[in-house]
A protein has these predicted regions:
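Active-site mouth of glycoside hydrolases
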Residues: 1-117, 121-138, 143-157
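Substrate-binding clefts and catalytic carboxylate motifs of secreted carbohydrate-active enzymes
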Residues: 55-59, 78-94, 99, 110-112, ...
Length: 295
């Protein structure tokens, strides 16, 4: 409750999620063993706890759910859970949705259509075709990007993808991505250029312990900030697209400059300004105007 109260105060929109599995298990001893017995009670507790919070805009009945694509029984479960949610959120304070890795399967698409609000995990490639097929279904990115980066680490050149490195760190030059993800700038454009898309939830805001990616490390590298909540460079990309130049002008330049003498380095500037001029030792290196087409 404390987390959602903070979101209420500062204006963060919450996709409030319940189940990580339904009847089909992900591990030997997970909640699938009790799902059918406890689902109604779990939904009641979940919805009644959070239904009066203005920050909650979505009730997600699951994420990465195996049942949704293997057969039509998943549709029946999804409809059951939707009805449970509506039983306790009878004023429809928030919509009912699901986050899906399996949206390319017909059964999963039908569930999204039935719910009316469908979350897509890393499947922006389906947006246009599915919007044409299901024009009345709201589409949004329930998980996007999954670019990995270490704060203050740069592996050159920027145009060479490299997920791992000898130092076991990830590059902050937008050239470290996992197989299922994409750079933050690309994921942003996928959403920005589609008026029918309701937005996206970026994976992730903050690094977290577990899911070591790349393996083997102690934690993930997905965050805009590290585990101490210190901003990485990509934090300033999101600041540049979420703020107004006329109200809060900003620019963030990377990387730092004390590399080996004579080593070519890639320079990146994140800004909400229409143009940026780069100076080295007082000498102009030219002006770059913002490229809206490519972010």
């Amino acid at each position: 409750p404390e987390l959602i109260e903070i979101c209420d105060r500062i204006g963060l929109l919450v996709n409030c999620e319940s189940f990580d599995m339904w009847e089909l298990p992900k591990t030997d001893f997970d909640n699938a063993r009790f799902f059918r017995e406890t689902a109604h009670r779990d939904v009641m507790s979940w919805v009644k706890r959070d239904r009066n919070h203005p920050s909650v805009i979505l009730w997600s009945i699951g994420n990465e759910i195996y049942d949704t694509h293997v057969n039509e029984h998943g549709y029946e479960i999804a409809e059951m859970l939707k009805n449970y949610v509506r039983e306790f959120d009878y004023k429809c304070n928030a919509g009912v949705t699901i986050g899906s890795n399996f949206i390319e399967w017909e059964n999963s698409q039908k569930i999204g259509e039935m719910l009316g609000i469908s979350g897509y995990n890393y499947t922006e490639r389906c947006y246009d075709a599915h919007h044409k097929k299901y024009p009345n279904t709201v589409i949004y990115g329930s998980e996007t990007s999954s670019a990995v980066r270490s704060r203050g680490i740069y592996h050159f050149p920027a145009d060479v993808p490299q997920l791992t490195h000898d130092d076991h760190q990830c590059s902050s030059l937008a050239n470290s991505t996992v197989g299922w993800g994409k750079p933050a700038e690309t994921a942003w454009i996928d959403d920005r250029d589609r008026k029918f898309c309701a937005g996206q939830y970026v994976w992730t805001g903050i690094d977290y312990i577990g899911e070591p990616t790349p393996y083997s490390t102690r934690n993930s590298y997905f965050g805009m900030a590290d585990t101490c909540c210190l901003p990485k460079d990509i934090y300033y990309f999101y600041q540049s697209v979420w703020t107004d130049f006329k109200e809060k002008p900003m620019v963030h330049l990377l990387p730092y400059w004390d590399f080996n003498v004579g080593q070519p380095i890639d320079v990146i500037a994140y800004t909400n300004a229409p143009a940026v001029e780069l100076f080295v030792n007082g000498r102009s290196q030219g002006i770059q105007h913002i490229d809206h087409e490519h972010g």
